[in-house]
């Protein structure tokens, strides 16, 4: 079947319907599978576009390691471009490490992008969260601090997924998201490797103080990937190489959920590139009467 309309809630909380010749879903790796799973019907009882059973599966969080460093003189890293320095020396997999994975290291303001963010997430572990010492640290170190960030592999695991919560609902009574996630041991080992290299870089650069963010189970992410994977085989993927659903020919998914692997760094530019590519393919299909 084909998608014919989208139901949504307006600003007053009233349900509305929008007819459409084509539907493009861009809700990221969490809200996109949630929407498709909530759109189950008699024709597609396991969720819209989910004949493969892969909607919501293989969630990837884009693993990272962090080191913060303070220097003697101001860096003013909060000004201008956020990321200007990138290292790819450790990008490729190296069997000599004893685990799978790779990644890049970039240097950026990150927690020192704004004073408020710095006070929340950029403080050294020995500084209290309030009082004179807290104020002194912000006043002196905000312009002198930078973060060294290692972006590494997050392996696609069938056990990591987005499902509909059977108990909790949102304000409209719709099922909330349930997230199930546990890092692969190799992902954590690679993150530890990059954290160690980041500490070496901070020390070699002359940091007067440096501390680790700490490597452990991933409990948050800005990058939600993999839950509506792209592929040629409808039995093992949700969308084809043009981001078109295998099951619903006028439904497209254009966000990080189409990733089959996490990559080894920031995914945003890849998501943007795929979105431009998908737009060209959708335009061509529409012109050919194929939507």
Question: Where are each of the predicted segments found?
Answer:
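A conserved FAD-binding loop/helix module that cradles the flavin
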Residues: 261-282
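FAD cofactor-binding and catalytic pocket of flavoenzymes
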Residues: 52-177, 185, 224, 246, ...
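Short, ordered coil/turn segments that flank beta-strands lining enzyme active or ligand-binding pockets
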Residues: 11, 171, 241
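Glycine-rich loop(s) and the adjacent beta-strand/alpha-helix scaffold that form part
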Residues: 6-79, 255, 274, 280-289
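A conserved short coil-to-beta-strand element within the FAD-binding core of flavoproteins
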Residues: 1-4
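A residue-level signal for conserved active-site and pocket-lining positions in enzyme catalytic cores
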Residues: 59, 164, 198, 230, ...
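A glycine-rich dinucleotide-binding beta-alpha-beta segment and adjacent secondary-structure elements
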Residues: 143-154, 158-159, 174-262, 268
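A structural signal for well-ordered alpha-helical segments within the folded catalytic domains
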Residues: 30-33, 192, 196, 269, ...
């Amino acid at each position: 079947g084909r998608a014919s309309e989208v139901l949504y809630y307006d600003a007053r909380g009233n349900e509305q319907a929008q007819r459409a010749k084509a539907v493009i879903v861009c809700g990221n790796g969490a809200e996109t599978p949630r929407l498709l799973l909530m759109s189950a019907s008699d024709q597609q009882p396991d969720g819209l576009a989910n004949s493969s059973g892969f909607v919501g599966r293989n969630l990837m969080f884009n693993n990272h390691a962090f080191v913060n460093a303070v220097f003697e003189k101001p860096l003013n890293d909060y000004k201008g471009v956020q990321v200007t320095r990138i290292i790819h020396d450790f990008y490729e997999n190296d069997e000599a490490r004893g685990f799978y994975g790779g990644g890049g290291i970039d240097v950026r303001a990150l927690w020192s992008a704004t004073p408020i963010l710095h006070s929340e997430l950029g403080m050294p572990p020995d500084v209290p969260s309030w009082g004179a010492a807290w104020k002194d640290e912000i006043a002196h170190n905000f312009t002198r601090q930078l973060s060294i960030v290692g972006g590494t592999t997050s392996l696609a695991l069938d056990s990591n997924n987005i499902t509909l919560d059977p108990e909790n609902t949102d304000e409209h009574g719709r099922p909330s998201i349930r997230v199930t996630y546990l890092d692969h041991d190799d992902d954590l080992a690679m993150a530890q490797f990059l954290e160690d290299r980041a500490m070496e870089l901070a020390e070699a650069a002359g940091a007067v103080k440096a501390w680790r963010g700490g490597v452990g189970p991933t409990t948050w992410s800005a990058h939600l990937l993999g839950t509506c994977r792209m592929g040629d085989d409808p039995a093992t993927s949700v969308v084809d190489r043009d981001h078109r659903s295998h099951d619903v020919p006028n439904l497209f998914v254009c966000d990080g959920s189409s990733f089959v692997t996490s990559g080894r760094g920031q995914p945003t530019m890849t998501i943007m590139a795929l979105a431009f590519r998908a737009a060209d393919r959708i335009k061509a299909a529409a012109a050919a009467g194929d939507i």
